[in-house]
């Protein structure tokens, strides 16, 4: 992987790593504002509220997929050395199984709780928004692994790739339909996951 080729004894340096991650957060804040501006202009207030409620609901629900496992990577990753990859694979396998279960259950619950009148047009949206939240949680383990081996700069790029992709696609769908915005929301985390898998 790219991180194996590029790192040569690179260590975790809290001050440096904090700067990289804080910079990524600042960039993503700008992307987040742009995303919300596009959504508020494109949707009626009810649709915007439902979209955000579903997204927030799924982000809360999929914390169950996290299972606290990435914390182990953050704590022990540097000490594990080459063994980190094996631990990461095991964690990813466990999270994938939890993710499959989540995708079967949470979209139905979210759609039932928050969509007025049982509009089936929102069911596809619920699936895509849940998928985006699930993928973000799975990506977190790989991002944490990058940070654990001293590559917070690469983690920063992964974070920006997620929100940046969503923002760019949102602008492209600015005059589009609800499903288009949901697709954009799902593609960003998928791009970030692909990048994280390539990097580690």
Outline where the language-model segments fall.
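C-terminal transmembrane helix end/exit motif
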Residues: 1-3, 7-10, 70-73, 141-148, ...
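Transmembrane-helix boundary and interhelical linker motifs in polytopic inner-membrane proteins
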Residues: 7-13, 43-47, 61-94, 147-153
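Signature of the first transmembrane helix
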Residues: 13-70, 107, 132
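Alpha-helical transmembrane segments of multi-pass membrane transporters/permeases
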Residues: 15-28, 85, 127, 131, ...
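Residue-level recognition of transmembrane alpha-helices
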Residues: 21, 25, 52-55, 95, ...
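Membrane-embedded alpha-helical segments of multi-pass transporters/permeases
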Residues: 33, 37, 41, 64-67, ...
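Alpha-helical transmembrane segments of multi-pass membrane proteins
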Residues: 60, 64, 100, 104, ...
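Hydrophobic alpha-helical transmembrane segments
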Residues: 123-130, 156-200
């Amino acid at each position: 992987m790219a991180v194996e080729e590029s790192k040569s004894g690179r260590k975790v340096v809290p001050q440096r790593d904090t700067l990289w991650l804080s910079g990524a957060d600042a960039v993503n804040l700008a992307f987040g504002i742009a995303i919300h501006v596009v959504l508020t202009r494109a949707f009626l207030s009810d649709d915007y509220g439902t979209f955000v409620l579903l997204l927030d609901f799924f982000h809360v629900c999929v914390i169950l997929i996290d299972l606290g496992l990435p914390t182990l990577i953050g704590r022990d990753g540097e000490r594990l050395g080459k063994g980190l990859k094996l631990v990461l694979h095991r964690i990813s396998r466990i999270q994938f199984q939890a993710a499959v279960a989540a995708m079967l259950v949470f979209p139905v619950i979210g759609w039932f709780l928050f969509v007025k009148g049982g509009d089936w047009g929102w069911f596809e949206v619920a699936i895509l928004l849940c998928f985006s939240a699930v993928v973000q949680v799975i990506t977190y383990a790989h991002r944490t692994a990058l940070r654990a081996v001293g590559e917070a700069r690469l983690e920063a790029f992964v974070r920006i790739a997620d929100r940046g992709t969503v923002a760019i696609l949102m602008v492209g769908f600015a005059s589009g339909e609800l499903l288009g915005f949901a697709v954009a929301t799902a593609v960003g985390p998928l791009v970030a996951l692909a990048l994280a898998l390539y990097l580690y």
